[in-house]
């Protein structure tokens, strides 16, 4: 007879931390230069006028203005641009 109870081991019990991806500032909203518009993996959204692309594909505003989402070209690329307020 075993003196200790056999303890099973599970191969589950791990999870990764949340990455908080997605659109942070929506179309028509005001934004300041340097603020993040979209956090993404890969370029689901492409940068347009007044928008920069970070090393991790984050889109951020280069100028103060209003955010504008559009689709362009035959590939229907979703572009984000910041229209400077006059």
UniProtKB/Swiss-Prot annotation:
* Gene3D superfamilies from the UniProt entry: 2.40.50.100
- Per UniProt, which keywords does this protein have? Ribonucleoprotein, Ribosomal protein
Q: Which SUPFAM superfamilies does this chain map to?
A: Ribosomal L27 protein-like
Q: Name one GO cellular component term.
A: cytosolic large ribosomal subunit
Q: Name one GO biological process term.
A: translation
Report if keyword Ribosomal protein is assigned: yes
**What does the record give under GO molecular function?**
structural constituent of ribosome
Ranges in coiled-coil conformation: none
Entry annotated with the keyword Transmembrane helix: no
Q: Which PROSITE patterns does this UniProt record tie to the protein?
A: RIBOSOMAL_L27
One Pfam short name:
Ribosomal_L27
Family membership = Belongs to the bacterial ribosomal protein bL27 family.
Q: What is this protein called?
A: Large ribosomal subunit protein bL27
Q: Which organism is it from?
A: Xanthomonas campestris pv. campestris (strain ATCC 33913 / DSM 3586 / NCPPB 528 / LMG 568 / P 25)
Q: Which gene encodes it?
A: rpmA
